[in-house]
A protein has these predicted regions:
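Amphipathic alpha-helical segments used for helix-helix packing
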Residues: 97-122, 170-174
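Short linear capping/connector segments at secondary-structure termini
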Residues: 72-73, 107-113, 175-178, 211-213
Length: 218
């Protein structure tokens, strides 16, 4: 009698491998430990994934798909271009706040594999940055068309916003205790987008100018 198919094996291996790759990097991860964590032998891991590299890229693909889905869901909440921009940033930051190991996995790809492997990388570490910036540019262009955003150069603004969001995540990972007070995706996304909302600079100038409400005598 043939052995029943374990339909949860790949999910368990992805989860176990995520923990190991995030904690120990590519070189430090041992397939037998991944298997033990997932409840199978080392041979069981290789039965599903032909190599450690194949397992690693399965992990990368899993988290990339999840991240892009989170950004798309955030941007797809409706409203103006400004609302979509804030939603996209909120989705991206929220994903990394909920899944810190995913960010570490992408850093392993950038730090170890791009320099050390000659095998074709189906999508290099820069691809995720490009996809994120492209999504932000779409929102910025829409905000310019519907009048909800005033950013000047959408490409430059997307680059700055993506860099700011990435910087937030880097600080979360490097100094979680110190950055703990600044882990709200909602607050961060709002703070990043507000300066580009139409009328913000005018409102800010009016609030800061002590003579704004002064009416000169006739």
């Amino acid at each position: 009698m043939s052995r029943p198919i374990d339909r949860t094996l790949e999910t368990r291996l992805i989860e176990a491998a995520t923990e190991w790759f995030a904690a120990f990097g590519f070189a430090g991860t041992r397939m037998e430990e991944v298997g033990r964590r997932a409840g199978v032998t080392k041979g069981g891991v290789y039965f599903r994934f032909r190599s450690k590299e194949a397992l690693f890229f399965a992990v990368v693909d899993h988290w990339r798909d999840a991240l892009r889905g989170a950004v798309a869901a955030g941007a797809g909440m409706g409203g103006t271009g400004a609302d979509e921009l804030e939603g996209a940033l909120r989705g991206w930051l929220g994903f990394h706040a909920e899944h810190p190991d995913a960010g570490r996995i992408l850093r392993v790809l950038a730090a170890e594999l791009r320099a050390g492997f000659t095998a074709e990388l189906r999508d290099d570490a820069q691809a995720e940055h490009r996809a994120f910036r492209a999504r932000l540019r779409e929102c910025l262009h829409r905000g310019g068309r519907d009048g909800s955003l005033d950013c000047g150069d959408p490409a430059l603004t997307a680059f700055l916003l993506a860099g700011a969001a990435e910087g937030c995540v880097s600080q979360w990972l490097a100094a979680p205790a110190e950055a703990g007070a600044f882990r709200s995706p909602e607050a961060l996304a709002e703070a990043l987008v507000t300066p580009y909302r139409t009328g913000f600079q005018r409102d800010l100038a009016g609030a800061d100018d002590p003579g704004a409400a002064f009416t000169p005598p006739l």
